[in-house]
């Protein structure tokens, strides 16, 4: 795992929601994330360490209220953790580089993978493929 900033540094540089999601395994309210409706071409990075996670070509509207992707950029991009919280069986996804919480993956996505990576906007930074503009979720 990469060296990540201290909790104090993160609290100073992140919004309350960004800290809650990435560091406390929280979930932003559905349909509120800044990147939910983003349709521009580019790459979604980890907000904490800037590791590339998802390409916009794999993003789709699942109707669940969070940005959804059917595949990460690489297997190394994502770390998978069994999550038995809240009386459910789920697979948590974390940044493969810094271990920040991203969301969960479910087996109900579209082809070609059949997977839905349900990701909190608050854990992402989008970089526009045309002009390099960055947008924090």
Swiss-Prot record:
Note describing how the cofactor binds: Binds 1 zinc ion per subunit. The zinc ion is important for the structural integrity of the protein.
Keyword list, A-Z: Metal-binding, Oxidoreductase, Zinc
Pfam family, one: SelR
EC number: 1.8.4.12
Positions that bind Zn(2+): 46, 49, 95, 98
Reactions mediated catalytically: L-methionyl-[protein] + [thioredoxin]-disulfide + H2O = L-methionyl-(R)-S-oxide-[protein] + [thioredoxin]-dithiol
A Gene Ontology cellular-component term: cytoplasm
Active site (record annotation): 118
HAMAP family given in the database record: MsrB
Protein known as: Peptide methionine sulfoxide reductase MsrB
Lineage of origin: Bacteria, Pseudomonadati, Pseudomonadota, Gammaproteobacteria, Enterobacterales
Gene: msrB
């Amino acid at each position: 795992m990469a060296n990540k900033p201290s909790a104090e540094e993160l609290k100073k540089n992140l919004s309350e929601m960004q800290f809650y999601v990435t560091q406390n395994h929280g979930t932003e309210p559905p349909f509120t994330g800044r990147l939910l409706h983003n349709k521009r071409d580019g790459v979604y990075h980890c907000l904490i360490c800037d590791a590339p996670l998802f390409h916009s070509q794999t993003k789709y509207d699942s109707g669940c209220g969070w940005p959804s992707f059917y595949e990460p950029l690489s297997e190394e991009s994502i770390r998978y953790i069994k999550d038995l919280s809240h009386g459910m069986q789920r697979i948590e996804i974390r940044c493969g580089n810094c271990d920040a919480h991203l969301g969960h993956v479910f087996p109900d996505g579209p082809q070609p993978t059949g997977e839905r990576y349900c990701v909190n906007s608050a854990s992402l930074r989008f970089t526009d493929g045309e002009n390099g503009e960055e947008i924090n979720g």
